[in-house]
Amino acid sequence: MGAWGQGGLASPTMTAPLARPTTSLSGGVGVAAHSPATAAAGMALLDAGGTAADAAVGMTLAACAVEPFVVSLLSGLHGIHVDVDGTTRAVDGFVDVPAVPTGGRRAETTIDFGGARMPYSIGGATFGTPGLVAGCWHLHRRFGRLPWAEVVAPAIEWAGTGFVLSDRDESLLHMLEPVMTLGVGREVFCIDDRMRVEGELVRIPDLADALRQIAEEGGPTLYEGAMSRELATFAQEVGALVTAEDLGACTAVEHTPPTVRLGGWQVRSRRGLSPLTDWVARLDASDGPHAARLALAQSPTPPKALGTTSLAATDTDGRACAVTASLGLGTGDWFRGSQLNSMLGEVDLLVGGLRPRTRMGSMMAPTAVVSPTGQATVLGAAGGSRIPSALLRTIDGIVLGELDATAAVDLPRIHRVGELVHVEPHLEDRDEAALVAAGFTVQRWTSRHHFFGGVSVAGAAGTQGDPRRGGVGLAHR
């Protein structure tokens, strides 16, 4: 019996006992996500009596249907959950290195980031063992209340009806054209020999059926069930290295995240490749002009990473849950409506090389901030190497600036790359002068931009998606 059969993990309806409320979420009950459709899925589950984890899991699965440029069922995730008694747990459902990590079929491509062209590896050999469904299953089993099939239902509905491309979607699609138009992607994202544009309907074949199977058989079907055998066969056909044994060995890992202090608050977040907790500690210990402190708290970060979404939810009992999920660029191969992740081709994540059957590193860092009075807010960010700086700025606004979620997300972002600091418009002149005085070269952007990442916030500070990434927040007041 594999790891999925241990400790009752094979039961799709098993959930953990729910604790009694002691935390406060004065900002209201709601969700935040990068897509209105994703947010709607989470809100429907809250309306049905679901927990924050139910909503977060449902949104993650729905995002696989309506945000296919950045996430799929064959991706990885990181999550954080704050229970009603304040207990905070992190869940790692990211991507594993397969047992045989080298060989296979690989291709090289280039992505144009608005004038900066960067090389990427794609193809089957870049596919890592996907932990997203394992992470969703674990979050639901530990912290959910609704039946599993009900949590998956909104994703099935969106996969069946399709979604209308937004202007942000069109921009992403055109940027990712070299991989999104391969294989099944050409059928999905092109029409009459051209790429689809804003306002046109996109529906991914076979995804609804795959989601129905996961709803009926539970998350383990992707790892030790019928679907796992299909996926292992498909992986071999496309030159991937993931085997049935690799899938069976992939499980979510739960742990207590480290805590650092900031202005009397507790900031709880994972480490791994994320430097966020170190940056928060530096910010708390430093003095001087605020903008310079924000930049000095940061350290040089990897230059590239693609394909991420973030979401957050709070429920009526005071629980909060945030998830960040990532596809990477994608391999260009599609299995039953889901593109394979390309994490083995993300060189920035391969710290220490490809070690067989190990969990890959990630910059993703869903985070909880808890006030001195016990009020909790969760947040996560998308944006590759800009994830920590986007979170740091938003946490700074909530904790030190005493701002609500909307105002904190709206703050001009500051992102350091070596001695160069990228800043968004509307940063005050005195703050820019402080950066220059601290020895930084300042590059001021002319408009608020998705380059600076997208933050989703829910909890005591309020509910807010990030307009830089087309995000929305929905709340019951």
Question: Would you name each region that the model predicts?
Answer:
Residues 265, 271-326, 336, 445:
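Internal maturation/activation junctions in enzymes
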Residues 69, 125-126, 301-304, 355-361, ...:
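Short Gly/Pro-enriched turn/cap motifs at secondary-structure boundaries
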